[in-house]
Each structure stands twice: as structure tokens, then as C-alpha cells.
Amino acid sequence: QLEDNPPPIVSAMGVTDGNATELPIFVRGNHNTPAKTKQPRRFPQVLSDGKPLAGEASGRLALARWIADEKNPLTARVMVNRVWRWHFGRGLVATTDNFGLLGDKPSHPELLDWLAAWFMDNGWSVKKLNTLILSSATYQMSTTASPSALKADANNVLLSRAPLRRLEAEPLRDSLLALGGLLDKQVGGFVWTFENYKLVFNHTSEDATTYESNRRALYLPVIRNHVYDLFELFDFPDPGTVNGNRADSTIAPQALYLMNSPLVLRATESIAKALLKEDELNNAQRVQRLYAQV
């Protein structure tokens, strides 16, 4: 019986090196007129005097080293700016995905450079960078602003106060489950029990995708052609594109979802049942407890 019904083989996508080859320069950019001699693979000579790549190497390792080289601080500056944006809602460079000539100038260039240097000196550790930012006086400021600060810096570009931020889609969902005592805090593992190929629509339009799970949103899969409806409503970015700055919209369907969603109803019902079990509280005290809890 075991031979007739073997257990499924665990598989994963992988990458292998192909056969490296040298290529000729195309005369005047025309692929139909290649030069007679082939050129060794290397970073463009007009930009660098580095050595050619080893004959059998794919070049991926060399590319990774170029990107993460301390002589190329752009990578570190882009990364620390993204982490800053995660915590403050706005990066030191507002155009998170564009550090080029058409992007915005940094609001605090010295701070951006210092953070980039610190990040590289500390082994490119995102965990340490998060700790540094979250323990800073800037992050721990109050959202209250003085009249003079509002007048001089209405958009809080200069960080005179902590920014007011709305919950994004993932923490909004997790907060609802946590308030209802329903959030599954298990670490690791899978949300679904079926194989990945079932997530692809077949000729019968069958779709096995479901988001009925109490696991944290971190573990929910992102299916590009079937994004979770809560995520779509609350400005989850298009998974098919690069987007370092999420939109921040306020639309009627968001309110309708919070009034009628099965997830919200399930969470609120769980909260209500827990409050009703506390016999020592009267209704007024239950309302106060609920207000403080939520």
C-alpha cells in the first residue's frame, strides 16, 4: 500500500548556473553585425577598471558583491530609507523607489548618509537598524504639535513631531483577530494544506484560494490574480509591481467592509462573549472595558 501511495515529494524552486560564454560587441548596436572578436564579461570599462570575470563564473556572485560593496553606498542609502519609511510613513527621500535625478531630494541628507554608513558598519543588519530607529528620540516623540511647528512645518517633513498613521491592511486584520482572542500566534509552518499548483486557475475556473485562517497576516500567501479582499480595500500594493510607497485612501467600501465583513463580525462576537462572561461588571463597566480594550 505504501508503494502504491507514496507520500508527496517536497519540492522547491531553485536556481542553477548555466554555461557562461563570452559575447561579441554589436557594431553600432545592431545584433546582426557582431564584431569579429568576443569580449570578456566585466563591468563596463567606461565606468570601472575592474578585472574581467572568471571564465566559468555566471557573474551573479560578482554582481551581488558590486551591489553590496562599501564603495557603493547607494544600496545602503536606499535600504535605510525604506526602513525609515516603514516606521514613519514617509522616507527621508519621499520617492522611495526613485533615488535618481527625477526623485525628491532628501529632507535630512546628513542623517541619511550617517544611517547608511552605520548600517554597513553593523553588518547590514535590518534588525539592528530597526532597534536603532525605534529607540531614537525622533521615533518616540508625541504626535502633539505646537502652533509654531504647524505653521513652519505643516506636513511634518522636518519631523518636529511623531506622524499620525493609519493602520495598514495586515496589522488591521491581525488587530481584529487579536482583540477577539482569535489570533493564532504560531511561528512558522503553512497556512494551507493543499499543493501550490491548486492556486493556479484551471480550465474549469476552480479556485482553491481561501483566507479563512487565524494565522498572522505575515503567513497569508499573496496570489497575484486573487488578492485577499481586505488587502485590496485597504491599499495593499499591486503584487505584480514594485511599490515602496503604499497609497492611503479613504473610500466608502472600507466602511462597508468594517460593518459587514464576516471577519469583523466574528471578531466582535468573540469580544462580546468574553465581556458577557465577566459577571462582576455591569453594562456601563462593560462599555468602558470595551472602549479601553479596543
Across the structure, where does each feature detected by a protein language model lie?
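Short Ser/Thr-interspersed hydrophobic loop/turn segments at strand-loop and sheet-helix junctions
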Residues: 223-227, 235-236
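Short beta-strand/turn segments that mark the catalytic/cofactor-handling region
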Residues: 216-222
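Active-site-adjacent segment of 2-oxoglutarate/Fe(II) JmjC oxygenases
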Residues: 251
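Primarily short, surface-exposed interaction patches in extracytoplasmic proteins
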Residues: 1-214, 231, 237-246, 259-294
